[in-house]
């Protein structure tokens, strides 16, 4: 019964920790992920939680049992013979000093083991995600060596913990045996002197074993405690991490917006970086307008659009929708009116319908199909073995890059956003498909009066934009329509000639 209840309790601890960790990870800001390795996070949710679970089960019960036995045996020894008890207990402080030094040394070692395991998981995760790139460049041997190097580090750290055990516990046993030797010597002299019987000495020595056993048990458990403590510290680093972007206590729901977007002296730098990515950016986009963002590499294009749904918070100035500062409204009400199609398309394991309806799980099949038609995805989806019920693999394996992007566009359109953000969202489709998608997007923008921000790589995307912003080193170097910038902006013409692709046929 004790074993069952202990295991049930430990599984409950692990269950609650996993839920709490995942819930926190879902809400941490993007700045946190910019500083953390995926492998380290996976290790904390798996291996570190398991170390805590193991100690929370058998370890806690054994520790409590050892403490009770130690206390009870001490009282019994003092009751039987005060002098012999004092001789026996004289070694106890020395044992606890040795154990304390052991715990202080082993704790950082266990933390290093978990960190090395996290690095190993990071390499594994990177290689599994990039297996095609590895094969394409024939880097299998290099990646094998890289994995072996991290694995060697993990092995070395584990062996160091083993050596720490080997270098400390023999001394603990030695001191414990000194206590037994003292009892036999001092008690034997008293037997010879006639003040103690042989039976009493044997009984006392037997009880002494009940004193040393819990001490040694506590010693062994101290290693498990140190390991669980190191894992707990890593787990609570996540649980105690501040959420950089969250609702204010007095945040209000954002009402349905016409979506007038205003950047007012916006400044931004990434957490831990002193370099400003955006430096006092100010502009205004009226409802229903399309704003194209262009700029040199590292000029802050993606950063600018990431501030609209509050993936990050500005470090100066303000971003407003219809006059509402995005920091003063709830995240759910803000993001429910924003549709985003990123350059790197992510699909989840599940059906095509589930992926398109990810933002609106209650959407009907007719609504899903309408969004797919608008994104020019309906035709190829209907050709799949089970149509919209076809299951796609992890990250959309089985679909081409262009097909994945069209599903992502359909997913964004289905939520009927008032603000649509396209981060080079047609980069993986051919020219004919890009022209068809662009035509549909243009029609949807005009008919629904959506405000659109687009980071583009093709001339056709920016030619018809109502406002083009040219960024350079975090500042707006030029703004205006295509015709105005062709006449007035040297930087725009350089980008036009060097970075943008020609307009597709029919675009």
Set out the residue ranges of the language-model regions.
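Transmembrane-helix motif of ABC transporter permease domains
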Residues: 1-15, 23, 27, 34, ...
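Short active-site loops of ABC-family nucleotide-binding domains
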Residues: 11, 31, 39, 43, ...
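Helix-loop junctions and hydrophobic alpha-helical segments within the transmembrane domains
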Residues: 21, 25, 134, 235, ...
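An intracellular "coupling" helix at the cytosolic face of ABC transporter transmembrane type-1 domains
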Residues: 30-31, 47-56, 60, 64, ...
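Transmembrane helices of ABC transporter permease
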Residues: 58-112, 185-196
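Hydrophobic alpha-helical segments in the permease module
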Residues: 92-100, 165-179, 198-223
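ABC-type nucleotide-binding domain
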Residues: 247, 254-507
């Amino acid at each position: 019964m004790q074993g069952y209840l202990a295991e049930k309790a430990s599984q409950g601890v692990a269950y609650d920790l996993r839920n709490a960790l995942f819930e926190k990870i879902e809400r941490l800001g993007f700045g946190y992920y910019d500083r953390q390795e995926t492998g380290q996070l996976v290790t904390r949710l798996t291996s570190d939680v398991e170390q805590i679970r193991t100690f929370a089960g058998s370890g806690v019960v054994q520790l409590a049992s050892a403490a009770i036995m130690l206390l009870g045996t001490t009282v019994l020894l003092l009751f039987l013979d005060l002098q012999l008890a004092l001789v026996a207990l004289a070694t106890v402080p020395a044992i606890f000093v040795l154990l304390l030094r052991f715990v202080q040394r082993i704790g950082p070692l266990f933390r290093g083991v978990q960190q090395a395991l996290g690095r190993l998981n990071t390499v594994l995760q990177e290689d599994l995600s990039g297996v095609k790139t590895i094969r394409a460049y024939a880097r299998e041997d290099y990646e094998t060596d890289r994995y072996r190097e991290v694995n060697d580090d993990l092995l070395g750290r584990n062996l160091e913990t083993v050596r720490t055990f080997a270098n400390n516990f023999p001394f603990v046993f030695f001191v414990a045996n000194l206590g037994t030797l003292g009892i036999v010597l001092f008690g034997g002299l008293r037997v010879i002197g006639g003040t103690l019987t042989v039976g009493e000495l044997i009984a006392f020595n037997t009880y002494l074993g009940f004193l040393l056993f819990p001490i040694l048990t506590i010693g062994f458990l101290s290693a498990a405690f140190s390991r669980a403590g190191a894992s707990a510290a890593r787990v609570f680093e996540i649980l105690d991490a501040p959420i950089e972007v969250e609702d204010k206590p007095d945040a209000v729901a954002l009402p349905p917006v016409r979506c007038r977007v205003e950047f007012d002296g916006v400044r931004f730098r990434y957490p831990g970086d002193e370099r400003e990515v955006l430096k006092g950016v100010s502009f205004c986009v009226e409802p229903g307008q399309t704003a194209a963002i262009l700029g040199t590499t590292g000029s802050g294009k993606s950063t600018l659009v990431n501030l609209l749904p509050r993936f990050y918070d500005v470090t100066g100035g303000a971003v407003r929708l219809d006059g509402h500062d995005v920091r003063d409204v709830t995240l759910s009400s803000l993001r429910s009116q924003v549709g985003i199609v990123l350059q790197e398309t992510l699909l989840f394991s599940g059906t095509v319908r589930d992926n398109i309806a990810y933002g609106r799980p209650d959407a009907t099949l007719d609504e899903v199909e309408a969004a797919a038609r608008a994104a020019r995805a309906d035709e190829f989806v209907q050709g799949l073995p089970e149509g919209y019920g076809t299951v796609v693999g992890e990250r959309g394996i089985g679909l081409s890059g262009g097909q994945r992007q069209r599903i992502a566009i359909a997913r964004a359109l289905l939520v009927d956003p008032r603000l649509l953000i396209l981060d080079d969202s047609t980069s993986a489709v051919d020219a004919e498909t890009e022209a068809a998608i662009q035509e549909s997007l243009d029609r949807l923008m005009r008919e629904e009066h959506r405000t659109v921000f687009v980071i583009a790589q093709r001339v056709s995307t920016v030619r018809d934009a109502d406002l083009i912003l040219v960024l350079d080193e975090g500042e707006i170097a030029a703004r205006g329509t295509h015709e105005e910038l062709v006449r007035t902006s040297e930087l725009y013409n350089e980008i036009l000639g060097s970075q943008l692709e020609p307009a597709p046929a029919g675009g």
